[in-house]
Swiss-Prot record:
Descriptive protein name: Cytochrome P450 monooxygenase nodJ
One of the record's GO molecular function terms: monooxygenase activity
Mode of membrane association: Single-pass membrane protein
CC per GO annotation: membrane
List of residues binding heme: 432
Natural source organism: Hypoxylon pulicicidum
Taxonomy of the source species: Eukaryota, Fungi, Dikarya, Ascomycota, Pezizomycotina
InterPro entries from the UniProt entry: CYP450_monoxygenase_sec-met, Cyt_P450, Cyt_P450_E_grp-IV, Cyt_P450_sf
Tree of life domain: Eukaryota
UniProt gene name: nodJ
EC main group: oxidoreductase
Length: 514
């Protein structure tokens, strides 16, 4: 959700703070980078390259922080982890604002009028509390159990492919959507409808004009229609009482809003924002993890050996055959290479942007001034690859760099990796609350797929598909098109049956967070 918020913040900071930036740059502020095209150059850069534009500027200038002058406003872009702890310590002056929450509700969900007024004040904290509480302990355990039951049939169906080519990313989207939404929304899950699922993904991939509010009734008519279809389905879901037999998270969010007098339709509109957070990162993360593993035969071999040795338990089935069970608790506790591979995917493929508003003039590390009314952005793509932290291989994928990591993290070369140099889940105190659920789902899929199947790209080479740099919904790079593959069942496990095992109370993953 935070990636959506930064887009909205960029769109509205001009209106909110524009007149304050006509003054000259204070010499203590980060260096001002002038656009190649006066006034609109930076806007054109973001429109063309997405948030990769910040990375391009970082590569060109190599500054720990810099300022961008928009037509009427200024942004501070932080590219070095050195400044992140100082920002965290100034959480009273530099913070994630509640107004950004209401802007997301208005632009993404379409909440308006009285409903928008109700989404202010204490309700923001209450909704966040409901989500955080539901995504740890019993609530997380229940969602994990439901997710496992829903994801296994999708993996079993891959056996029927029999070397027929299929789009790997489309499969990830469909499988993750069904498993995630079944666990979140329960038996009456509205996303089981193919029409609703398709409308959601079409909307999530084409929100630009809606968020920027550029005559959306003309420029984004299809996106508005897609949103309406999802809102109608969610409204019916609540009217029929689907939330009464759903996850603790879904019921908790509904209860907070219902008790505040928010209408069912506006609750449904707010749920679109939540659904984007649930789905838009998990599917591409699953795709890239499978891609990076299968494109590296030696890594694939090592991961298979690790899983078989540490997390797969074999026992006879009722029909006399063999059942192989993957224990997800063992994956968390014993499969450090698989966790490292996943973490490296997040490090290298992150499109996340941390955003903060500055409420008072603030000097960081006794030398850098951030002025009141400014917007701070921290692109994970820059911080996650910082060579002063990650070493000269910071721009390269290395799944082995986390082996033997300590509390802060130590790379294979012994280099200390501080948590603030990993921004894929955001930065404290606003860390992604759903990271443990998403991680469990992704690693369950990846573990079973790589153990059961060999996979080859139709084109013969593992050439990374182009990323859709303009998608606003995902904090992970999303493939811009199809990626066709074929697979076959591994001979050593042919005709074996597979299952998962989940241990309640043991659902948190030891991943780096900022």
């Amino acid at each position: 959700m935070e990636l959506i918020v930064i887009i909205i913040t960029l769109a509205f900071c001009i209106l909110l703070y524009g007149t304050r930036w006509r003054a000259a740059l204070d010499p203590r502020e980060p260096r001002l980078i002038s656009p190649t095209v006066p006034l609109i150059g930076h806007i054109l850069g973001i429109a063309t390259d997405g948030f990769g534009y910040f990375s391009k500027l970082n590569d060109k200038y190599g500054l720990p922080a810099f300022s961008l002058q928009m037509p009427l406003s200024r942004l501070y872009v932080i590219t070095s982890s050195e400044l992140v702890p100082a920002i965290q310590r100034q959480s009273q002056n530099i913070r994630f604002d509640t107004f950004e929450f209401t802007l997301a509700a208005e632009r993404v969900g379409g909440v308006s009028g009285p409903g928008l007024k109700l989404l202010k004040g204490s309700i923001v904290d209450e909704l966040q509390h409901a989500m955080h509480h539901a995504l740890i302990g019993h609530g997380l355990d229940a969602m994990n159990l439901s997710m496992i039951e829903a994801i296994k049939p999708s993996i079993d169906e891959l056996q029927s492919q029999k070397q027929a080519a299929f789009d790997l990313f489309a499969w990830c989207k469909r499988s993750i959507t069904m498993a995630s939404t079944d666990s979140v929304y329960g038996p009456m899950n509205p996303f089981r409808s193919i029409e609703v699922e398709r409308a959601f993904w079409d909307f999530a991939s084409n929100m630009n004009m809606i968020i920027l509010n550029v005559l959306p009734f003309l420029t984004a008519r299809k996106s508005l229609d897609d949103r309406r279809k999802v809102v109608d389905a969610l409204t019916e879901y609540y009217n029929l009482g689907g939330h009464e037999n759903s996850s603790e998270m879904t019921y908790g969010r509904w209860e907070v809003q219902y008790n505040k007098g928010i209408t069912t339709q506006d609750i449904a509109r707010m749920e679109i924002v939540n659904a984007i957070g649930v789905l838009s990162n998990t599917a591409p993360s699953t795709f890239w993890t499978l891609f990076e593993i299968y494109s590296r035969p030696s890594l694939l071999r090592d991961l298979r050996q690790e899983l078989v040795a540490s997390a797969v338990y074999t026992h006879p089935g009722t029909d006399g055959g063999i059942v192989r069970t993957i224990d997800l608790s063992a994956v968390r506790a014993k499969c450090s290479l698989l966790l490292g591979t996943f973490q490296e995917v997040l490090r290298m493929r992150s499109n996340a942007i941390v955003t903060r508003m500055v409420h008072e003039d603030t000097i960081l590390n006794e030398r850098v001034l951030f002025k009141k009314g400014s917007v701070i952005v921290i692109p994970a793509r820059c911080v996650n690859r910082e060579k002063s932290v990650w070493g000269e291989t910071g721009d390269s994928f290395d799944a082995y760099r986390y082996l033997g990591q300590g509390k802060s993290g130590t790379s294979r070369s012994g280099r200390n990796v501080t948590r603030v140099a990993f921004q894929s889940f955001g930065t404290a105190p606003n860390i992604c609350p759903g990271r443990h659920f998403a991680s469990g789902e992704i690693l369950a899929v990846v573990a079973m797929v790589i153990l059961r199947f060999d996979m080859e790209p139709v084109l013969g080479e593992w050439i990374p598909p182009k990323a859709n740099v303009k998608t606003l919904a995902s904090s992970i790079q999303t493939p811009a098109g199809e990626f066709m593959v074929t697979l076959r069942e591994r001979k050593e496990f042919k005709d074996d049956k597979w299952d998962f095992r989940v241990t309640e109370g043991d659902s948190k993953f030891p991943l780096l967070v900022g």
